[in-house]
Amino acid sequence: MHLNSDYVKTTDEINVKELFVLEDLTHELKPYSEIEENLKKMKVLAKEEEPQNVLKIKKICDNCSFKDYCWADMPKISIFNIPRIGMKAEMLQEEGILDAKQIPPGYLTSATQSKWVEVFKTGKPYINKESIIAWLNNLKYPLYYFDFETINFAVPYFKNTHPYEHIAFQFSLHIQQKPHGDLEHKEFLFEGKEDPRYACIEAIKKFIGPKGSIIAHNARYEKDIIEKLATLDISEKDKDFLLSLPNRFEDTCEVFSKYYFHPDFKGSASIKKVLPVVCPGLTYEDMPVGNGGDAMSAFMLLYFDKLPKEEAQKLRKDLLAYCCQDTFAMVKLVDFLYGCI
C-alpha cells in the first residue's frame, strides 16, 4: 500500500480509499525468501579476514551510510565531481581512473565536462565572458530577486492539493532599479490557519511590478510554484498576472552551470557551493534556519502552534533571515558576474 500521487483532496475530509493504492509486489519479495540462508553465510564471513571491496563505486553511493568506508581512498576531486558523468564513470574505473585530473584529453565528448576536467587540472576558473555579458545584457531592470519557501505534506492538508505537493508559505524579494543600485527588500511569511497560497498570491501582486526581470537560482522551481498558484480558484486577471511571470525569469544557476566554473564548486552550481567561493564570508553556516528542510520544519512548528510565544517569535525571525539570505545571495552573484566582465 502506498500513497496515490494522482489523488487530489477536494473536500475537507480525506478520502482514504482514494488516497492509498494497493499494489501486488509478491514477485519482488521472492529474493527476501533467501534472507535466512544468507544470514548464515554472513555469520561465517564475519569470522574471516575482511575481503577487498570489489564493488564499483557509483554516484548513487551518496545516499549510502557506508559511503565514507567505501570511498576512503577516493581522491578529493573525483570523476564523480564531473557533472552528468553517467556510465563514463564505470568505464573510467575499469581503466583505473578515479581522479578527475587524470581523465585523458578528449575522453569526454561533452564540452561542459571537458571544461570541468580542465578546471580541475589547472586549478583555474573557466570564464566565458561573452556569454556572461550576453546574459547580463538580457536583464531588464528593475530586477526582482525572488525565492520561495514551501512545505509538502504527504497527506494533503489543504483543498485542491495532492500528496507531496509544494505549498508556498513564504518568499523573499530584493528589488534593484539599476546595476549595483540600492536594494529594497520585501518579504512574505504566512500567519494564520488558512491555506497560505491565497495570501501568497496577494503579496506577489503587491510587490512585483509589471516590468523587469525576475532572478532566481534554479528558476524552474519558482516557475513551477507560480504556475501551480495560477490553477487555484482566483480571478482571471490574477491568473493572467501569475502566468505572465514565468517568462520574465532569468536563472543565475544557468550561468554557473555553463559560463563560470571554479574548481572549488566541485562540479556543482548549487548556491550553497557557489556562494562561499564567489562571495567569501556570505554563508549559511551557523544560521538557526540554514536550508529548505529547516525552513519547512520551522513553518510546521509555527503553523501548528507547537512553541511558546517567545520561541515562536524568534523562530519566525530566523525563518525570515534565512529566506532573505537566499535572495541577497543572488544579488551578490549578479554583482560578481558584473565584476567578471
For each of these PLM feature ranges, what is it?
Residues 78-143:
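N-terminal accessory regions of nucleic-acid-interacting proteins
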Residues 68, 148-152, 175-177, 192-194, ...:
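Short, flexible loop/turn elements at secondary-structure junctions
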Residues 131-210:
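Conserved RNase H-like, two-metal-ion catalytic cores of nucleic-acid enzymes
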Residues 72-74, 91-92, 101, 153-156, ...:
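Short helix/loop capping segments that flank catalytic or ligand/cofactor-binding pockets
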Residues 3, 12, 16-19, 23-79, ...:
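Acidic, Mg2+-coordinating catalytic module of metal-dependent nucleases/exonucleases
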Residues 95, 139-142, 172-176, 203-214, ...:
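Generic, well-ordered alpha-helical scaffold segments in large soluble proteins
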Residues 1-36, 185-296:
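Conserved DEDDh/DEDDy metal-dependent 3′-5′ exonuclease domain
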Residues 65-66, 76, 119-134, 229-232, ...:
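Short, motif-level signal for alpha-helix interfacial/capping segments enriched in acidic residues
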